[in-house]
Amino acid sequence: HYSSRRQRQMCIRDRSLLRETACNQMKSFIQEIPNGIYESSAWIDSDGVINEPLEIKLAITKKDEELEFDFSGSSKPCKGPMNSVLATTLSSVYLAMRHIFPEVPINGGAFIPLKVKRPFNTFLDAHYPRPVSGCAAEVSQRIAEAVFIALVEVLPSRVTAAPAGTSGNFALGGFNEDTNSDFVMYQLSGGGYGGNSDHDGLANGCSTIGISKAPPVEIMEQKFPVLYHHYALHDGSGGAGKQRGGFGLDYKLEILCENAQASFVMDHGRYGPQGAMGGLDGEVNVVNVQQSNKVYTPIHLSKEQDIQLTKGDTVHVKTPGGGGYG
């Protein structure tokens, strides 16, 4: 019993030490930033219901060893699924700071010096029954973009221009006559990363909130009734600059079953990822659906539900390039 109690005490002590170490490291990095207020804005294309952009307005106040993140003035709660719960808003800020200061260990102590002012009455503090299915994959990345753009000028060697900032969610469902069964295909897509002070942005990188991308097209074609016409880089999509943004992804697939439905939850279809330090914005996300003899572009550009497809129709997606730097 004494041994077990002693081990528990040591674990508690070690956990406290790890948290304290991470907290102190984050504080030391924050001191690289001069005291002051740093502002930015980032935009969601629309909420998928009302075709108007949503603004994320951010003011970061640096005072000594702390940063305060204030999203007051951001757009009001929306009707569509692009609201963010508070937990996602907080974690998106923490994620962005982890990208900026990757040396700091990941534990709760690292976030103690990061104070997020609760964004009451905005779409970044959603409450039931507001729909929130787009917050984790899409809104989170735009929050991170706002943090990057606010701090890039004061931390030019640590912060990049904005990355593609979308998970490229594409769902296709229907009935596969070859297997005599229903199917649902889900594809996540990469995009270009922002350029930085040292080099061009990464081409077709994973989304900034995860490490998932689509399986090889050969596997997708084996499992689902689709044929990829091409799967390549979105040539020239990176924003121009001293260090250009990385290229996004360009893919086109054909429907091989009799009927299917396509849905998209993406972003950056209206505004490209922001450039930094004078660099230009990256190219926007583009979705085109070829239905028989007509080309359909979603009303909300990057968001649409249950587009009806028949055999021979095609889906063509170009994901955003990263912003240019300098």
Spans of model-derived segments:
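Amphipathic alpha-helical
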Residues: 13-37
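Short beta-strand elements
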Residues: 54-73, 174-176, 181-190
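Helix-loop-helix junctions within predominantly alpha-helical proteins
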Residues: 27, 84-88, 92, 99-292, ...
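Flexible, glycine/threonine-enriched loop-and-boundary segments that flank and lead into catalytic domains
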Residues: 36-59, 233-236, 296-300
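Single conserved hydrophobic/aromatic residue that forms the stacking wall/gate
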Residues: 1-12
